[in-house]
Amino acid sequence: MSLFGTNTGFGSGGTGVFGSTTTDSHNPMKDVEVTSPPDDSISCLAFSPPTMPGNFLIGGSWANDVRCWEVQDNGQTVPKAQQMHTGPVLDVCWSDDGSKVFTASCDKTAKMWDLNSNQAIQIAQHEGPIRTIHWIKAPNYSCIMTGSWDKTLKFWDTRSPNPMMSLQMPERCYCADVVYPMAVVATAERGLIVYQLENQPSEFRRIESPLKHQHRCVAIFKDKQSKPTGFALGSIEGRVAIHYINPPNPAKDNFTFKCHRSNGTNTATPQDIYAVNAISFHPVHGTLATVGSDGRFSFWDKDARTKLKTSEQLDQPITACCFNHNGNIFAYASSYDWSKGHEYYNPQKKNYIFLRNAAEELKPRNKK
């Protein structure tokens, strides 16, 4: 029996509709609270692809679980199912047809979760925790790409226990993104590698990092023809780099900007600087969202090089974000990211996932 259309909720929790009136410090933007969030820090979020009717949200957490919610048209969320790993879940993704979800964990395995049967099977194995997982749909092949702290990038046919290909990286994989035919992987020690995926995956170029501090997140952006043309890279130093792969004028087209900083404005009063935890591009407008350890999200227009909006400050960091397939819903997760160490961890604090109506706020600035 399909899970879609049945309510197999896993507990109770608060929810609402767009425009609810709560004013708690955990939800200063008055956004919709997703029902039954995970019991530990939320590491990743992913919305279902456009091939699926409706909107389904997947979230992975440090409680070793992956959860699925249906997001109804009125903003209500219905818990559908969950699966477990034996270690924290670090990344999730969907197959292009929406029938499968893929999960990557610190337990050194990746799993394929069939949502119709609610069965999950192991499809990948590394010698270290798996940090990233992406579905690749090429004209001549489809596979899963996993990036690990064992310094390898592996490509898996889900029907085979052995990888189709294994590529060595100079360092541990910290973040990655895929928009066919491009993949970008950022590693420890500020490594940055672009891969081309046509015919078969291969290393295309190593790039000197435009950022001076540890890489935290990366997201590929597209041109007006929907072809991947560059990426945004976020670091722990409250900064994002916009980098084109083949820009007409590299010195002019590539740039960095500061974000997720507060207080001080000059050298006499230093700024508080926070990590950029996630970056997500709007699927229609090409604008982007960043979320940070400062507990804020911001929306940006990279082409106009301007900020569109910054949220009020939540009472804990924002650890993950994503847009649904048509860009109408922005999901973001609020939970502790351990950026201030164990002494700032409060086990009494709940974790939250919020949904925001993003149809208007992400529209690019009008060109004058």
Swiss-Prot record:
Q: Tell me the domain of life.
A: Eukaryota
Entry keyword annotation includes Protease: no
Cellular component, GO annotation: cytoplasm; mitotic spindle pole; nuclear pore
Compartments (UniProt record) = Cytoplasm; Nucleus; Cytoplasm, Cytoskeleton, Spindle pole
According to the record, where are the WD repeats?
Answer: 37-79, 84-114, 125-157, 168-206, 215-255, 271-301, 310-346
Q: Quote the Pfam families the UniProt record gives.
A: WD40
Asked whether the keyword Cell inner membrane is assigned, the reply is no
Q: Name one GO molecular function term.
A: ubiquitin binding
Q: What is its main location?
A: cytoplasm
BP GO terms, sorted = cell division; regulation of mitotic spindle organization; RNA export from nucleus; transcription-dependent tethering of RNA polymerase II gene DNA at nuclear periphery
Q: Where is this region: Disordered?
A: 15-37
Keywords on this record?
A: Cell cycle, Cell division, Cytoplasm, Cytoskeleton, Mitosis, Nucleus, Repeat, Transport, WD repeat
Q: Which family does it belong to?
A: Belongs to the WD repeat rae1 family.
Q: What does this protein do?
A: Plays a role in mitotic bipolar spindle formation. Binds mRNA. May function in nucleocytoplasmic transport and in directly or indirectly attaching cytoplasmic mRNPs to the cytoskeleton.
What name does the UniProt record give this protein?
mRNA export factor
* Native species: Danio rerio (Zebrafish)
Gene coding for it: rae1
